[in-house]
Amino acid sequence: ITFDHVFAEHKDTRIIIATFASNVDRVQQIINTACKYDRKVVVEGRSMVNIIQVAQELGYLNVPDKTLIEIDQLKNYPPEKTVLITTGSQGESMAALSRMAADVHKKVTIMPGDTIIFSSNPIPGNEKSVSKVINELTAKGANVIFQDAHVSGHACQEELKLIYSLVKPKYAIP
């Protein structure tokens, strides 16, 4: 399932995407798709905000002007014109998405019809906490997508070979 597919199918709802803050390429895909569908983007979660800011400063993330808005500006836009990129894809109790699901987030309330995408599979051991968050979101009437939206953040064998040939380390542990 691609972001383009999800955005096209859920054009009348707010979209919230939980992903790893460190997966800058995935964040870029989300921003590109949000721009294509004329949506404003809110970044939520301390690690997400910090990493995106650094990635922009270093030129690793291309964000068109006026795409990102502050969370306080959400109320100025119709829900179907917004996307939230957030932490919490692993069900971490203090992450932004978990706080939204538990109704303790100070600025975002999950509404019936919201589309929530878990953009990564649960790491072994996190299944119970991820399921808890999914159940809380579903109970609030959100449409939760958690299958077929995963991309690996790890290098494949050929990518490792390329890195080793470029860096030429004395020792390497993949």
Give the ranges of each region predicted by the language model:
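Acidic/His-rich, metal-assisted hydrolase cores and their charged scaffolds
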Residues: 1-174
